[in-house]
From Swiss-Prot:
Propeptide stretches in the record: 20-56
Species of the source: Mesocricetus auratus
Methionine amide, modified sites: 68, 107
Site positions for Cleavage: 59-60, 63-67
Family label: Belongs to the tachykinin family.
Function field: Tachykinins are active peptides which excite neurons, evoke behavioral responses, are potent vasodilators and secretagogues, and contract (directly or indirectly) many smooth muscles.
Signal peptide: 1-19
GO biological process, one term: positive regulation of cytosolic calcium ion concentration
One Pfam family cited in the UniProt record for this chain: Tachykinin
Keyword annotations: Amidation, Cleavage on pair of basic residues, Neuropeptide, Neurotransmitter, Secreted, Signal
Protein name: Protachykinin-1
Amino acid sequence: MKILVAVAVFFLVSTQLSAEEIGANDDLNYWSDWSDSDQIKEALPEPFEHILQRIARRPKPQQFFGLMGKRDADSSIEKQVALLKALYGHGQISHKRHKTDSFVGLMGKRALNSVAFERSAMQNYERRRK
């Protein structure tokens, strides 16, 4: 048991001494190295720097297709206002919501009332059965 303790102490002392020797040879302050951005750029290898630039690059607005689908890049506010005026007639825009008995979401078309849902489920079942 005493031999294991002696070996462990010897190992810890030798690692401490080797760490002090490495620290004595390195005269640079660790935190001041990171403040100089030119040294950081030179220290990074070219492929690694390229990967970091690709990660940091933001996509163009035309490249982003959200849940609403592709956006028209050349559409302006004037075109949208003209379209709304044409749809609703001479600038009178109706703010009423036209509610229907179905909802189309990400999971597909769903009925809002249970009677219509049960009826459509039965019709689908009958159709598949034939």
